[in-house]
Amino acid sequence: MQRLMCKGKIHRATVTQAELDYVGSITIDALLLAAADIRPYEIVQVTSLRNATRWKTYALPAPEGSGKICLNGPPAHLFQPGDLVIILSMGMYEENEIADLVPRVVFVDEQNQIVKIEEHHLITNGEALT
């Protein structure tokens, strides 16, 4: 049996743009994508800290160091510049792969520049092994 697990996330990123008339996707600074182990065209879930809205779409790279977080297409109705979001990537894992899973959490500042990267290890006995 496979399980859907968190493999990486960008925590508390600030939306910089919302482009309703674009085809779709979320455009994310390429440095943030790499740090969170998110590939171009990978499906991600975007969650608003303002209103708990969740949206699934695919990620596209923005120029490195740009700090760009742009929701394109329909989610532009739900996410506005200045909103804080969590961008989560997931993967399907076999039971025997889960023990080796080490999701990356990328923390950013108000300009979406990387402040810290944490690797979260398997939780055992109620404590995360980091």
What function would you assign to each model-found segment?
Residues 3, 8, 97-122, 126-130:
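Peripheral, non-AAA+ core regions of ATP-driven protein-machinery
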Residues 5, 15-16, 20-94, 99, ...:
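Compact, glycine-rich, soluble single-domain proteins
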